Amino acid sequence: MKVPLSAFSTYSTVNRMTGEQQLIIWHNGEKRVVKSPRTHKYYMHDKKGREYKVLGKSTTQLLREYNVENLGELRPESISPLSKIDGLTRNEVERVCIEHPNFFTEFESREPTSLGFDLEVTSADGSFPSGPQHPIVAVGIVTDDGQRKTILWDGKDDKELIIKFAEFVKNYDPDIIYGYNLIGYDIPQLFARAGHHNINLRPYLNRDNHETYGWESDFSYHKKSKVETWGRLIVDVYNFASRDYALAGLSKRLKDVSRFYGLKPIELDFNLNDILDYDLDTINEYVLSDCDATKYLFNHYFTQHKYIAEVLKVPLETYMNSADSFITKILQGRALFKRNILTFDKNNERHPEIESFQAAHIDLYSPGFHRYNYKVDFASMYPSIALALNLGPDTTRILRYEDYDIGKFGCESADSGLYMILTIPDNVLDKNVIIRVDLKDKSCLYKMCKQFKEMREPYKRMGGHEAKSKSNGLKIMVNTFYGANTNPYMSYGDIAVGLAITGIARWLILGAKNIVQKRYGDDAVVYIHTDGVNTNCDIDVEWINDELRNAMTSLFPLSESEWISVDKDEFKEGFWIAIGNYVLRNLDNSLTKHGSTFKSRSRSQFYVKVLNKLIDARLDNTVNQDFIKDIYNFENYEVDDFLQSRTMNQNIGDYKNENDLVVQLATKAKAEGQKVKIGSSFYYYKTNGGVELEGNVDSIDDIDIKYHWNIISNLLQKFDLTQWINKKPPITALDRKQQSLLEFV
């Protein structure tokens, strides 16, 4: 690995003899303490000072520079409240990454060793097994060197199990500990049970036997994204899956994600059973199956993230535990630092008048069924606009605002060719935003986008998982610039970049729409979303590219219009329900689903089955009386198909309405002796008498048929099949005894 595992530095990591700021760096499984390469400084306004460029300022600022010995001397209480710190941060590792880009490459490390684990926990009282009262039955372990191991409890107590697991981690000494939802569940549950037995796990799980550092966790259920440790990196594979666009609209349960990627994980029924209802051999196979699936997914995702850290030249842990804006923060921060442009404020401080602005263009022009579907897809639209117009925080700034007039959209180019003035009408601001773009030097965004696009090309042509991971990693790096520059809390970027990109993107996408309609007719355009135009006819993308580039050159004479390009995606049948809600059949007959109608995470199997039948019939154009009779036939469904779920995301007292469904379910669960808390999941049925928890409904006769009948009717309406709706269920559907009587007669 071309970078170290992690780096750490705070006010306290100072050499007491010399006063030097130090960094603690972990690589090759060992700790190194080295001197920070930075010169620590702050600035004060001074009429006799030097001239400095400051981001967002139209003129240079007179400032005096003051050097100090270490980070501690930059504490707020140690310097004047009028002083300024470049980047507004006292994060030492971040500033080393920015000011000394190659520093951490001096600490190359071996390929990181890893250990994955999964807990199986028994419920002490029938509630969801989270908390100190619920013992751990088994811990499954997998390692990068091929070990597969299960530690089982002795049938009475899990104290010995916990100690054995902790000792295994200590002896194996992995660089990375990973699991699936381990931050939201496994780690807090492990520490809850360890606390129950008065065991301090930190000396085992931290390196250096550190007794107090890190491992702060709670049952956050995906609300907490990281856990810090001493000398190791914690990776929650769930966080990878939750950002995987390939899984859009799908459940992110480990079993579901595993099956999506071709695995066959073992399933056990926990609807009515506890883990201890199964024998130890079954538990052993089950927990190792989960560990194997998690290891596969870890290896699948990790390659990409390690590569990004290496390209950024930052410690692996620093990148992995960072916010989405980190890539842009580091790269733009480096560019600004190299050009001696200081950053003293955040976006929302530079532009307090901008609380929000006009978004990308989205519209549905022709809802319903379309037999043929093609998409004009802009290639890396936002980065391409930045390239074409030389946009970047170091070249782009807002000059002023004028009255809103969409007819004034465009550009004035200086005769010298050294800058251009963009006019971006914005209907949310109700202003025309006048933006200056300097052209004397290439912007940092231009250089970085160009570099990463060139780096990506060979990987796009190569096969294999590693090449695909690196290609996707570079794509992520290119596509993060836009969001980061519009982030109100970003210091190393400017919202002028985002405003310009979004405004020109709207012009381009509507231009593509007009070009398509001009040649193929007004009815050819079905849907527009940000960077794509969906059509119902085949299209000539080369002609569209020529038209767009000619328009770009005409309106923006100093632009590099060759960066703007579109590709063509082809689909089979498709159905468009509403903006953001559609389904398309791909050429390989798989489906692309988008929108709330098609999300099935909390839906019942009844809903999913009805929806899937409707999709197939609507796209195949096979809806007829027999199909409608079948879809309304409740004999096709079993009682378990009607099971739904809800999760309690706040304390009961915080819900505003006592009739809220979650409050009803929690009240029933408490009445049955279950302990309910934030994160508790309730599985329930909608019955004739209201809602009932799982286990209290045995027959489909108890199910509220009218409620589920209306679900079918509503879906038929969404798919433009109103004429096929049966408004009321017959008496024989509501009461199966009537059906039996009818059959008898």
Residue spans for each PLM region:
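Short glycine-rich phosphate-binding loop at a beta-alpha junction
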Residues: 175-182, 523-527, 534-536
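C-terminal, non-catalytic extensions of nucleic-acid polymerases
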Residues: 471, 542-745
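DnaQ-like (DEDDh/DEDDy) 3′-5′ exonuclease domain used for proofreading
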Residues: 1-173, 199, 289, 295-309, ...
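Common nucleic-acid-contacting/processivity interface regions adjacent to the catalytic cores
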Residues: 271-390, 399, 467-515, 527-528, ...
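Conserved catalytic palm subdomain of right-hand nucleotidyl-transferase polymerases, strongest
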Residues: 117, 235-236, 368-382, 452, ...
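Short active-site loop/helix that positions an aromatic residue
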Residues: 186-196, 379-393
